[in-house]
Amino acid sequence: MALLNLFFCLVFSSPLMAMPPVLQGRKSMSPDSILKDTSTDDGARDFQGRKFPQFMMQLYQNIIRGRDKDLSNLEHPTLQESDTVQSFITKSYTTVGNHWTLFFDMSSISRSNELKLAELRFSLPSFRKSHSVTVDIYHTNDGKEKLFMGSFKTKPSAALDADCKVFNLTILLQNFLTRGKRLIKDEYIQAKGLHLKDLEKSATEKGTENVDTLKQDQYHVSDFAAERIMLVVFAKEQSHAKSDPPSLGKKLFPSKYGIDDNANKVNGFRRLRRNKKEKTQIHVSTGPPKPIEEIKPKCKKVDMFVDFQKIGWGSWIVYPKAYNAYRCESTCAVPLNETENATNHSYIKSLLPLSDMERKECPSCVPVKMMSMSMLYYENEDFILRHHEEMIVEECGFKDM
């Protein structure tokens, strides 16, 4: 996959066009201010004592700004279909000559999601200068078990002169997650002098050996900037998995916002009660006719600001720290008028006299159109950028109770 690697490492354009730039607002809450306030000496970003890759913050910035012009014809439609971006920082890595072995904990990858794209991102100078490299990928859980997932060979020094090398591991990861098979593949550049059968034989040996017994120089993640070796996974929640609550729903207890009962009580039509004298009297008005009072919609959208820090979720939500979710509010007038967003049934019911109904109900003023929002947060020791549906009220209208 042809990429402008330097561009992707420094200014990643918006891949998820379904994510609208809905976070408006305060200068103190801008993504730029977060990057500035949380910078550390090694280039990583600090959040609640945890380091997270600058790439994820830059990706989030570009998503909410709607930048997508520089995406290639291949990445644009693929990334547009994703609703989750998950980053995995390497737990450790080993090198023996030009043979690199990387260890990731990918326990949090859900098999119920459809994998769209998996990128391995390198920004180590020693890797960029290598002429011919074989890279092995392992899954490890707390360092106790090491499971070989696949391998690829490449020639970093022959690629574009970029500070960050990006490799497409989509097939490798898909093959392992869906079939449990290891994959040895040339993703980008053929390395001269290496044969596929030799790699397959080596991979078979790797699947059964204990990597710790090899005489290798092992470096841990604490010895270098967190984002220098990272696996980024783009995924889409499948339709059959929609019945399960999303990750945000599993973490949060949804708040219920009710409408004031006093505002919803209906007294019915005002009926003019005239006595016998009033029926026989004729009133003549000499003044100008009174203008008909404009009937305004009774169901409207009002502000509802959510501060994640105040409700106890600030410890794991990186951005946004706060946003306007809006809510619907009404005074429930009958009969309904044509300016109010209601069903035909609501219109008819509002016109019936009180005597014809056992109970006069007020149509509920509820959201009829919702907007999505992108969120960057910490989950299962990984940083995730996820697109959550129905987070912001866009339009309100009447519906039957």
UniProtKB/Swiss-Prot annotation:
Tissue: Expressed in the dorsal marginal region of late blastula, becoming restricted to the dorsal blastopore lip (Spemann organizer) at the early gastrula stage.
Keywords associated with the record: Cleavage on pair of basic residues, Developmental protein, Disulfide bond, Gastrulation, Glycoprotein, Growth factor, Secreted, Signal
Compartments in which it is found: Secreted
Pfam families: TGF_beta, TGFb_propeptide
Disulfide bonds: 299-365, 328-396
Function: Exhibits mesoderm-dorsalizing activity and neural-inducing activity, but lacks mesoderm-inducing activity. Regulates the expression of specific mesodermal and neural genes. Induces convergent extension movements at the embryonic midline by activating the fgf signaling pathway to induce t/bra expression in the organizer region. Acts with wnt11 to induce Spemann organizer cells and induce axis formation. The unprocessed protein antagonizes bmp-signaling.
A single GO molecular function term of this UniProt record: growth factor activity
Quaternary structure note: Monomer. The propeptide region interacts with bmp4 in a non-covalent manner.
Signal peptide: 1-18
Propeptide position ranges: 19-274
Protein name, per record: Nodal homolog 3-B
Domain comment in the entry: The propeptide region is both necessary and sufficient for bmp-inhibitory activity. The propeptide region and the N- and C-terminal thirds of the mature protein are necessary for neural induction activity. Although cleavage doesn't appear essential for activity, residues surrounding the cleavage site are necessary for activity.
One CC-aspect GO term: extracellular space
Keyword Kinase on entry: no
Primary localization class, coarse: secreted
Family: Belongs to the TGF-beta family.
A GO biological process held by the record: gastrulation
